Amino acid sequence: MSTVDFSSSNQTTFLITPLCDNGSNFADYEPKVKVLCGAKGILKFLEGHAQKPKELHVANGVFMKPGTIDKPATEEEIENAETKMDTYEQNEAMCKHILMSSVSPHLCLKIKSLATPNSMWVAICTDVKNKSTLQKMDVR
């Protein structure tokens, strides 16, 4: 089975053997996905602990300072909030990409519509655990 290549910005390459549709290589796949997510700083998305940044309140089309409803935010505060949200969304998308590109097309169809990387990960783990011993041993 071929491997999936994930390169980082500093040219470090991580290789993961995709999860077999029958889950027979899950013992190898699971720690590699966790290490890859940890190396990319996105393990909290996989585990469901990522906290979405708070959005700035908008009143009459004007962004308000964090924690207020009547004081306009500065340009720096707006940019900071947008940067935090962009980073969060990019990291969430990266985690989803890792999961979707490292499972079989059949399993990808099952998980692609799930909202979070954690819900995808839970679905992958559940799918593997629901495979019978006979199915796992049948593939050699």
Please report, for each region that a protein language model flagged, where it lies by residue.
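N-terminal Lys/Arg-enriched interaction segments
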Residues: 1-140
